[in-house]
Amino acid sequence: MKSDCMQTTICQERKKDPIEMFHSGQLVKVCAPMVRYSKLAFRTLVRKYSCDLCYTPMIVAADFVKSIKARDSEFTTNQGDCPLIVQFAANDARLLSDAARIVCPYANGIDINCGCPQRWAMAEGYGACLINKPELVQDMVKQVRNQVETPGFSVSIKIRIHDDLKRTVDLCQKAEATGVSWITVHGRTAEERHQPVHYDSIKIIKENMSIPVIANGDIRSLKEAENVWRITGTDGVMVARGLLANPAMFAGYEETPLKCIWDWVDIALELGTPYMCFHQHLMYMMEKITSRQEKRVFNALSSTSAIIDYLTDHYGI
């Protein structure tokens, strides 16, 4: 686990409770947990463009607790990286609470992934299979609450919905009763992929909860974010692919501005972002502003210097 400043300094920076944002009455704009992508450099970028709260990529709690190598590779932060939620994949309350204790000085809270539909995750007892195990979810929340006594440290869950929405409402109410801080709802079932998001279901869940609820699914612009926020009555919206394509989305840009691309280059180079990640993010950002031929050329570039030369030649960056 890496940090660019002393633990005591980070603790001071983390004092603000994200819950306060949800109670402000304003739209809370959240960067989703994205495997490989929502790491420190990308979080730094989206924070420059009106993102209020960021999540780390999903981290397997068991590996994180047992392996120093996993901690060093999976979790990096710095003083400006807040408010921050660390998302864990877990199916064991003790291991999750151990992981939460490790990140507690460096983050504002942890989130339990109860929504990942990937086969490998569900086969391991992680992700979306947990929506069918409310007692296990409750146990994990309780254990973290008992083991981490830091004031304001949040414990949240991110879920998908059931075909029978009553089961989802029951899950959420049980989680709330156990002490969960807020719930993020992706408005699809575990079996659904590209079907329309059930925003009406998210609205019903919110109406049955006293804690904050975040809406998630198919939000590609600030206008869409504001619309989903209004129609669901939720406290915030979480965006994944929309931010990959346009990290400046929450600031109201319809497509990635050149300044954002330049900011990404600066941030990625400063933080030592691996080339593959650096390049992949640019491919997402430039999707809408490059022709098919330009994409072929840009996507084939194989070094940081080649990318910088390309951007300089084509965009004056």
From Swiss-Prot:
tRNA processing as UniProt keyword: yes
Name of a matching Pfam family: Dus
Active site: C116 (proton donor)
Alphabetical UniProt keywords: Flavoprotein, FMN, Oxidoreductase, tRNA processing
GO BP terms in the entry: tRNA dihydrouridine synthesis
Entry binding sites for FMN: P33, M34, V35, Q87, K158, H186, N216, G217, D218, A240, R241
The protein's name: tRNA-dihydrouridine(20a/20b) synthase [NAD(P)+]-like
Source organism (scientific name): Homo sapiens
Gene: DUS4L
